[in-house]
Amino acid sequence: MAAIDLNSDLGESYGAWRMGDDEAMLAIVSSANIACGFHAGDPAGIYRTVKAAAEKGVVVGAHVSYPDRVGFGRRDLDATSEELIADVIYQIGALKGVAAAAGTTVRYVKPHGALYNRIANDAKQGQAVIDGIKAIDPSLVLMGLANAPILDLARKAGLAVVAEAFADRAYTPEGQLVSRREAGAVLHDAAKIAERMVQLAREGTLEAIDGSIIKIEAQSICVHGDSPGAVAIAQEIRRRFEADGIAIRSFASDR
């Protein structure tokens, strides 16, 4: 039976401000990328989300970011390697403490937003993130954009990696994510998205924004928790996968 991981960005609420529906998403996904306080999330909310993930058997990952709450971590920063290494260590360390208190462990790291996009092709910042992960826990898996150079860089440094595709994002013919600033970059039709993800899981291909077919080898699929209709999209993907005999299972289950 074909199997693939389904992940979502969670724990991003802050105080009275609510982002997404963590409880609903945790009933659907197999892995949860938990905010670590740098782009979103407060201690009580992060703890609550990690506890809920542990109770549901969902694997927990550290969703590390640039220090940018105002910009929700979506603004690019020219951080030095020293700063970035320390930021990564700090965030993973914080989530490890929360996870221990909640009776679970942090199994992987997925950078967020601008940091995720930057390190996909920026070797200097990518190496800093890798060095930060290795400094605190070299057993952690790095999740990154499928087909991006960061995955090879991490492998060469001795880290295990997982390639990720995005359910609700359009792709360029080169296999990169279409910028959110461009029309059609974010997808909203749950049925069409689910059909695309079945194609990805079965054939390892997707239709790019220009209609061409591109190769995407991914072991995990992300549904952004803050996207409009995120829960409905995730539910439809899960329904289609179950109907087509595709198992939803965290990549960490095999490690």
UniProtKB/Swiss-Prot annotation:
Pfam families per UniProt = LamB_YcsF
Q: Which domain of life is it from?
A: Bacteria
Q: Does the keyword Hydrolase apply?
A: yes
PANTHER family according to UniProt? 5-OXOPROLINASE SUBUNIT A (PTHR30292:SF0), UNCHARACTERIZED PROTEIN YBGL-RELATED (PTHR30292)
Describe the reaction catalysed, as an equation.
5-oxo-L-proline + ATP + 2 H2O = L-glutamate + ADP + phosphate + H(+)
What protein name does the entry list? 5-oxoprolinase subunit A 1
Assembly and interactions? Forms a complex composed of PxpA, PxpB and PxpC.
Task: Say which enzyme class the record assigns.
Answer: hydrolase
Gene behind the chain = pxpA1
Could you give a single Gene Ontology term from the biological process aspect? carbohydrate metabolic process
Query: Keywords, A to Z?
Result: ATP-binding, Hydrolase, Nucleotide-binding
In terms of CDD domains, this protein maps to: LamB_YcsF_like
Q: What is this protein for, i.e. what is its function?
A: Catalyzes the cleavage of 5-oxoproline to form L-glutamate coupled to the hydrolysis of ATP to ADP and inorganic phosphate.
Q: Which family does it belong to?
A: Belongs to the LamB/PxpA family.
Q: Which GO terms describe its molecular function?
A: 5-oxoprolinase (ATP-hydrolyzing) activity; ATP binding
Q: What is its EC number?
A: 3.5.2.9
